[in-house]
């Protein structure tokens, strides 16, 4: 994993770049012209850096972003990546670029620092406090919950990072934010070297993105990088073995959250007598579970993690409770689309891996499951084995439909299975299986790009097909 020793400011790289660097005229190569790359390039240009941007893509979207940056003074080259960094003193890479890319290995071999947009933002953060969230699943929901708690507590705050808003934009806001709720992926953490948030949570760790990281150990290490500094309060999940194991090595204060108050060591935030309880920060009872809209185990777990982060920042128990009572999840995350003839239709298109789909399925007693898409090299056996008791039927789409069907045949042979060519057909097939009291759940357990632009487009098409049935 790219760690402390490879970040400028740690004594590495030409010019020993530090937080007090003069950016004027500094040659910086920005790799990728997506959301974070575009934001990083703009921020660097605003500070007077000499910016060159490269991207392997050359679509109309790329061309539009390139035109914007050229107008601001950047050099932009599309349609391929160079073999090396040229005369750049710093490389700022988009998170999707793997560390094995020749451009990245070439820069590292030449002693040129490689940062991500998060590293830039941390060095430009001013006086803002950061509360950071990572994990295989639940990051966005937890970050949204945390943002709601901060707002309820009267903080001038916002959410940023993998949730949508680039962090370099958030730290540049005027007037400045007091606190940022930051969602970070393993990709982003790999290219982040000096960040030391006030508190950080690792929600869970399950196999994902293993091809990018090169294995499960490197993936877990990237997640653990979120709390590598001793000044960070590290928050781990007692119900997730890997998160709890990683927490044991954190150098700062350690806090556990979890659903079982009898677990050992006992979680500092847990559920007791139907209430979310904070013993770690002295908050006592925070809220009754019965007062929450979403009470599935993984949603309660997310709420405990968000509460731990908010309490670490000093948000009061009453504000946390009020925020959770009012909280509604964003689109495509266990979002109820409609109830038609006693059948509930739920969009969890954000469940893009088996671990996320398992958490979603565990929240419903009788499910017609719509699943499938582009597999990330993961197995579906554990998912099907754990979910078989709630499955009434499965409707499969996408490239990995056969893989899921094979897992169903092995572990849930009595569950009816039907394949569908697209979302309209999938909704039609699911409606034929579903009866009063069932939930039709889109929890694909796979990525979307084989059939759809992204998970949001997949969820939107599901919702449109469902609403068309309402007449």
From Swiss-Prot:
GO biological process, one term: peptidoglycan biosynthetic process
Location within or outside the cell: Cytoplasm
4Fe-4S keyword on record: no
Signal sequence region: none
Reactions performed catalytically: UDP-N-acetyl-alpha-D-muramoyl-L-alanine + D-glutamate + ATP = UDP-N-acetyl-alpha-D-muramoyl-L-alanyl-D-glutamate + ADP + phosphate + H(+)
Coiled-coil residue spans: none
Main location: cytoplasm
Keywords: ATP-binding, Cell cycle, Cell division, Cell shape, Cell wall biogenesis/degradation, Cytoplasm, Ligase, Nucleotide-binding, Peptidoglycan synthesis
Molecular functions per Gene Ontology: ATP binding; UDP-N-acetylmuramoylalanine-D-glutamate ligase activity
Binding site for ATP: 135-141
Any one GO cellular component localisation term in the record: cytoplasm
Stored PANTHER family: UDP-N-ACETYLMURAMOYLALANINE--D-GLUTAMATE LIGASE (PTHR43692:SF1)
Job of this protein: Cell wall formation. Catalyzes the addition of glutamate to the nucleotide precursor UDP-N-acetylmuramoyl-L-alanine (UMA).
Protein family per UniProt: Belongs to the MurCDEF family.
The protein's name: UDP-N-acetylmuramoylalanine--D-glutamate ligase
Taxonomy of the source species: Bacteria, Bacillati, Actinomycetota, Actinomycetes, Frankiales
